[in-house]
Amino acid sequence: GKVWDWIKSTAKKLWNSEPVKELKNTALNAAKNFVAEKIGATPS
């Protein structure tokens, strides 16, 4: 119902908000660097 729609739209707004984008990018880069280190490659 309405509550679920509100939860979904709020979650979507949060997911696409700037602070969360920053966090996602930071986490992504950290993961990439971690994997690159493990396999002995340098991230491009």
UniProtKB/Swiss-Prot annotation:
Transmembrane segments: none annotated. It is found in: Secreted; Target cell membrane. Keywords: Antibiotic, Antimicrobial, Cytolysis, Fungicide, Hemolysis, Ion transport, Membrane, Secreted, Target cell membrane, Target membrane, Transmembrane, Transport. GO terms for biological process: defense response to bacterium; defense response to fungus; hemolysis in another organism; monoatomic ion transport. Pfam families: Antimicrobial_7. GO terms for cellular component: extracellular region; membrane; other organism cell membrane. It comes from the Eukaryota. InterPro entries: Antimicrobial_7. Expressed by the venom gland. Belongs to the non-disulfide-bridged peptide (NDBP) superfamily. Long chain multifunctional peptide (group 2) family. At high concentrations, acts as a pore former in cellular membranes and causes the leakage of the cells. At submicromolar concentrations, degranulates granulocytes and has a weak hemolytic activity against human erythrocytes. Also strongly inhibits the production of superoxide anions. Has a strong antibacterial activity against Gram-negative bacteria but is less active against Gram-positive bacteria. Also has antifungal activity. This is Opistoporin-2. It comes from Opistophthalmus carinatus. The lineage of its organism: Eukaryota, Metazoa, Ecdysozoa, Arthropoda, Chelicerata.
